[in-house]
Structures are given as structure tokens and as C-alpha cells.
């Protein structure tokens, strides 16, 4: 599993902690939805292409024939490596040479495409989804012609790694990027505190619906109260 000792300890502590209290929610929404996909060491965000205008996220047009796009951000050396070493992990944390954005395109629904992953469905407002798309667009580094710069093949689906903005480090990693994206979209998440995949998923149960879980989570609070909502 990819990861670092410090974040792993935090994940273990969070797993043993009681679940966060769930406050009464606003009126449930019918979408648009995004999906948080836990890959064990980091969390990606899957978006349905038909819900996002390419004028807001123009780079998505490259994969216009696919129903979903999943995105994630990370270190330029560590993230594209199928089996990252401890040495690469330490280098990413303390001597990162840059960052990349991974984009994967696919047609099956996220629960089917990522058949073994923990998944949380999050309902956004239309404005929230547009703000999320702007956040993703702003993460690309563009060339002189205004096009994204592909630097490596993607890990799954059809896609690629693209040169990205931002400096990767221990407290500014793939999971804090995902948490910031959710915060920009209007979700009540502590972006600075969610530095592990477990931390992001733990926070997201406050406002999302668990599609596929893992101990110790439950989808519906025992006391019948509802979730918070993204604005």
C-alpha cells in the first residue's frame, strides 16, 4: 500500500475513534452527484461528464465520449508509479520535483468500475459542481497553446497524468487536494485536517451517502438524524 508512516498512524487512530456526530441536514438533494473513491492511500473524485460544461472544464472535452471522469492529484514521481517504494514516498514528501493531475475516463458507474473500493456519493448544488470543475481546471498547467501537458499514461480507464500546479508535501498531499476540492464545492469538510484517505472518507460521511463501506462505518445514523449537506 502506498503511504507514509505518519499519515498511516493518523489513519489508524481515526479508525479507532468514535464516528463524528451527525447534525440535522438540509432538505436532501437529487444531485448533481460526485463520487469519492478510496484507493487505500488516496481518494479520487469521479464526476459525470454530462453534468459539467466543457466551457468551465475545457480539458474534459478530450474524453467527451465517456460518461465519467475521475481525477486525483499527487507527486509527479510517486503518483504515476504502479508500485511506489518507500524511497519515492520520502522523496515525494520532502523533495518533490512537481505535481501531476491524474484523469481517468470510463463509462460504467463508479461502484461498478471501482468494484473493490470504498465509495461515498455526494450531492452538490449546481453552483458547487461548477466551482469544483473550475478548481480542477485551475489545477492543470497549460502550454503556450493553452492545452494540458500530458506526462505519463493513466493508471486505469482511458486517461493520462498531466502536469499540475501546486507543491506536493506531507501536509499538502493528494488527500488534502481532494478535501480542498470538496470545500470549494461547498461541502462542510476540514480540508487542512484530512491528510489521509481515511480522514477524507471519515469526514465525508457527514454529508455523503456511503455506497460501499468498510468497518467501522454505517450509512444511516442509529438515531435517525440526517446528514449535513453541501451548499
Residue positions per predicted region:
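Bacterial N-terminal signal peptides that target proteins for export
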Residues: 1-6
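C-terminal motif of bacterial Sec signal peptides marking the signal peptidase cleavage site
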Residues: 14-15
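Activation targets extended, charge/polar-rich intrinsically disordered C-terminal tails
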Residues: 18, 138-231
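Non-catalytic ligand/cofactor/substrate-binding and regulatory segments of enzyme domains
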Residues: 22-33, 37, 48-163
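A short, compositionally biased
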Residues: 39-41
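Short beta-strand scaffold segments in enzyme catalytic cores
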Residues: 44-46
